[in-house]
């Protein structure tokens, strides 16, 4: 029994040495200040220092998790290395060379049921996180369609995901819901709606009141549905319900992969932030085609010139 008790006590002491420990208040305060300063965080962002656990990969260091919460569900944990003397903290990025980063990122984007343009069999997929009220999105949309769609043809598939910036664009979520109501019956109706809104955003903005702007969106939606012979009663019911579930799920997915502005494109996983030139888009598309073993379009000298504004 004595041997058993001793063995149990030894095992207990070993385990106690490995369990997580709360960061002492003074250490937690230092860590929080360093994180706030380095990432230039405003006071309303909540920084929480988690437990300290021994590192199994880095001798001489412990691991500490820091949670950064910007509100509205935008919360993420970051792992740091903390020296045993608590005087040094490191932020390392670990790369898994057995996985392709672009393929891994694309696998995190759910494209199920989304309307597409181009060929579904294309080896290059362009995912655009779009906001119908965003003026830069409108300019990007008019670069992608029809110019790049015509130029790349069946070499590329284009897919749109919802990422309305509701804090600054009050009718963007409503427009996204309306567009998805159209898509539920006919993907072509979705694209005609997207083409129209991005080309005629002022028509909605020109209405005098917020309610009138939403009514204008619904009117455009019903007209597009009529054009494509959609079931008017079903479309009207969908528009009236304004179910934001799918839109907000798309927004959360964007948050998870680093989207924080619009437009944001992923070309076979390569991220492009904001409005960029058509030359940069062509270069990225061509690179993705070459990586996929596909031919790039043959261009004339005139097609290489900057697009007119």
Give the ranges of each region predicted by the language model.
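A broad, structure-centric signal for solvent-exposed, well-ordered loop/edge residues
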Residues: 8, 56-59, 89, 124, ...
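Bacterial N-terminal signal peptides
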Residues: 7-17
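N-terminal secretory signal peptides that target proteins for export/translocation
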Residues: 1-4
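Cysteine-centric redox/oxidoreductase cores and disulfide-bonded domains
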Residues: 21-28, 32-34, 65, 165-262, ...
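Short linear sequence elements within intrinsically disordered, low-complexity coil regions
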Residues: 12-13, 44, 66, 271
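Extracytoplasmic thiol/disulfide redox context detector
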Residues: 18-171, 244-258, 285, 290-309
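Residue-level signal for mature regions of secreted extracellular proteins and peptides
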Residues: 11-13, 127, 231
